[in-house]
Amino acid sequence: MARLAGVDLPREKRLEVALTYIYGVGRTRALETLEATGISGDVRVKDLTDPQLVELRDYIEGNYKVEGDLRREVAADIRRKVEIGSYQGLRHRRGLPVHGQRTKTNARTRKGPKRTVAGKKK
């Protein structure tokens, strides 16, 4: 099993897809990485040679912030916004959508399950 940036890549998948299992590497970055290292995206992970793995590992760790480092940075950014009391920090603290989405309806992912409020008596 090939390990890159602390992630076990699925052996049967094409390299182009397998790289996206790394947090911080999407389709675009995977293609950029393959182009820069000169490795074909059609190669299966199980068919990679050790020098190719080393080259991929060096390129990803040298050029991108991925996995733990990226998660820590994102968490620190959110923590900073909460501490300085910005609007976005307030939305994070209250568990509401941060980027201006509507909340009268929808936003159930951020707000959690619906809490029923007693209706007005006639």
Curated annotation (Swiss-Prot):
Keywords: Ribonucleoprotein, Ribosomal protein, RNA-binding, rRNA-binding, tRNA-binding. GO terms for molecular function: rRNA binding; structural constituent of ribosome; tRNA binding. One of its GO terms (biological process) is translation. Residues 91-122 are annotated as: Disordered. InterPro entries: Rbsml_uS13_C (IPR027437), Ribosomal_uS13 (IPR001892), Ribosomal_uS13-like_H2TH (IPR010979), Ribosomal_uS13_bac-type (IPR019980), Ribosomal_uS13_CS (IPR018269). The keyword tRNA-binding applies. It holds the Pfam family Ribosomal_S13. It comes from the Bacteria. One of its GO terms (cellular component) is cytosol. Part of the 30S ribosomal subunit. Forms a loose heterodimer with protein S19. Forms two bridges to the 50S subunit in the 70S ribosome. Belongs to the universal ribosomal protein uS13 family. Located at the top of the head of the 30S subunit, it contacts several helices of the 16S rRNA. In the 70S ribosome it contacts the 23S rRNA (bridge B1a) and protein L5 of the 50S subunit (bridge B1b), connecting the 2 subunits; these bridges are implicated in subunit movement. Contacts the tRNAs in the A and P-sites. This is Small ribosomal subunit protein uS13. The lineage of its organism: Bacteria, Bacillati, Actinomycetota, Actinomycetes, Micrococcales.
